[in-house]
Each structure stands twice: as structure tokens, then as C-alpha cells.
């Protein structure tokens, strides 16, 4: 299934790169927008839909999981010099043979909501930053798809954009504060360093890690991902198409192993909450 998904994503990435292109959009404008999409704090309203396929999961290393993250990003203009960036992740999970004797599960996972208060302009040294809370919401539709815990903690991101490069890191920590007392407590640190290079033709190559440390079990989960994205226009609608591959450097005994695959479609929408 992973190969099929990757082939479909790659075919779309290359065959649709000029589909519906708006002649009024200059090459420079497209490249600038493509690079802006590498900035988690960009003043852009977007809806990324990201598919991640992982394998060799569970006690017998026979399980597989397709996780589709719906990730709306909404910037709110609080004042002349400040934005509040809302980043939500709603996972739709399809998994099989991960838990012995439980078969397959399909449904929603737990939702996370991050709010970043961020100055609109970079610092004198060229840094962009944002900080705020992250909330974990127990929205899972199956007990095997979520932790049945409410969580909260701090979140922050810092980055710089120099020429075609975007370099930075995003981090958060979540503690469980309420929920099912029979389920394990949550104390988890997430660290995401990232680097991206955007070419003048609106192609972007990115490398990142999405590392997670579970303080309750004292275990790391460390995948490293590389992806290639292309910004295209369907009429006047900008859409970024991305295909990528990753590898698990470290994971718990029952966690995913080996290669992972990713495909993402990111829709760039007019900002309805800009206050303009």
C-alpha cells in the first residue's frame, strides 16, 4: 500500500505541476509563496492534508498504519505588530494488526491545537519566533486510536529565512491533566528541527525530524523525513503538492520501523480572519 500511495503522490507531483496555472502569477510570486509555506508562522491561511504511512508496528512487527492529518492553519491579526497563529492537527487513522487479537481500527485520533503569539516582523538578527500553549483533546473514536486524556503544555517555534533557505525548529511539551484514570499518564516532548531550500521555479526540498520523547516510558521515537514539494495553481488557487520518504532511526519496541512514506496537499486560502 505504501508503494501505491507513493507512486500516486509522485505522479500527481510531476504531472500536475503546471495544471491550471494562472498566467497572472509571476515566477517570483510563486517562488516567494512556496518559500512562505516553509514558515510555520507565515501570515497564510492554509489547509494541509498530510498522509503518512508507517509499517512494522506492534509486538510482531506486522502492523501498518495510514495516518491522514488534517492540519488547518489560521492566522489572526491581533494588533498592528502581532499575529496569533492557530495550528490544529486532526488525525484520521486506519491501522491494522498493531494490537494482538484486535484486528483493524479506523477513525479519528486525538486532536492537538497549538496557538503561537508571534511578532509580524523578524528581530534585528533576522529571527522569527512564536510561543504559546498547546492543547491535547481526546477526540479519538476508538480506545486504540487515542489516549483518552486531556493535555496541555507550552509550545514554541523559532526560524530564520535567508535567501532561498528556511532553517528552524518547533517544539512542545504536553502533560495530561484529566481523562480516563485507567489510561497511562502523558508527559511527552516533541522536537521538530527543519531545513528547506526553495528554487526560483517554486520547487522546495525539505528535511526534518519529528522526534518525540515519552517521559513516562523513557523512550524516543525519531523519524527523519525528506520531501520534495511543488507549488502549482488551479485557476487562482495556490496548491502545494509534496511527496516524501522517511526512516525511523529510533522507536519503542512496538513502534514503527524502517521506511515511511508521505504525501501532502496544501491548499492556500484567502485569510478570512485577517481583520483587514
Task: Please report, for each region that a protein language model flagged, where it lies by residue.
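Transmembrane beta-barrel domains of Gram-negative outer membranes and organellar outer membranes
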Residues: 21-276
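Bacterial N-terminal signal peptides
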Residues: 2-15
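Boundary at the C-terminal end of the N-terminal hydrophobic targeting segment
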Residues: 15, 19-21
Amino acid at each position: 500500500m505504501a508503494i501505491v500511495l507513493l507512486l500516486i503522490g509522485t505522479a500527481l507531483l510531476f504531472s500536475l505541476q503546471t495544471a491550471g496555472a494562472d498566467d497572472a502569477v509571476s515566477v517570483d510570486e510563486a517562488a516567494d509563496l512556496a518559500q512562505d509555506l516553509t514558515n510555520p508562522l507565515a501570515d497564510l491561511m492554509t489547509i494541509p492534508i498530510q498522509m503518512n504511512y508507517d509499517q512494522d508496528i506492534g509486538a510482531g512487527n506486522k502492523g501498518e498504519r495510514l495516518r491522514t492529518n488534517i492540519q488547518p492553519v489560521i492566522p489572526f491579526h491581533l494588533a498592528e505588530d502581532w499575529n496569533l497563529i492557530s495550528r490544529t492537527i486532526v488525525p484520521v487513522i486506519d491501522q491494522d494488526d498493531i494490537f494482538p487479537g484486535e484486528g483493524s481500527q479506523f477513525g479519528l485520533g486525538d486532536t492537538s491545537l497549538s496557538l503561537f503569539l508571534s511578532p509580524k516582523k523578524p528581530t534585528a538578527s533576522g529571527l522569527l519566533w512564536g510561543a504559546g500553549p498547546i492543547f491535547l483533546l481526546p477526540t479519538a473514536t476508538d480506545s486504540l486510536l487515542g489516549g483518552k486524556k486531556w493535555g496541555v503544555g507550552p509550545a514554541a517555534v523559532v526560524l530564520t529565512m535567508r535567501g532561498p533557505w528556511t532553517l528552524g525548529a518547533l517544539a512542545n511539551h504536553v502533560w495530561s491533566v484529566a481523562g480516563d484514570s485507567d489510561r497511562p499518564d502523558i508527559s511527552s516532548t516533541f522536537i521538530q528541527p527543519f531545513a528547506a531550500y526553495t528554487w526560483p521555479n517554486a520547487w522546495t526540498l525539505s528535511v526534518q525530524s519529528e522526534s518525540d520523547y515519552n517521559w513516562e516510558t523513557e523512550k524516543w521515537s525519531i523519524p527523519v523525513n525528506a520531501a520534495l514539494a511543488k507549488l502549482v495553481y488551479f485557476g487562482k488557487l495556490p496548491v502545494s503538492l509534496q511527496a516524501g520518504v522517511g526512516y525511523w532511526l529510533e522507536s519503542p519496541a512496538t513502534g514503527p520501523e524502517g521506511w515511511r512514506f508521505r504525501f501532502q496537499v496544501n491548499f492556500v486560502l484567502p485569510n478570512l480572519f485577517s481583520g483587514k
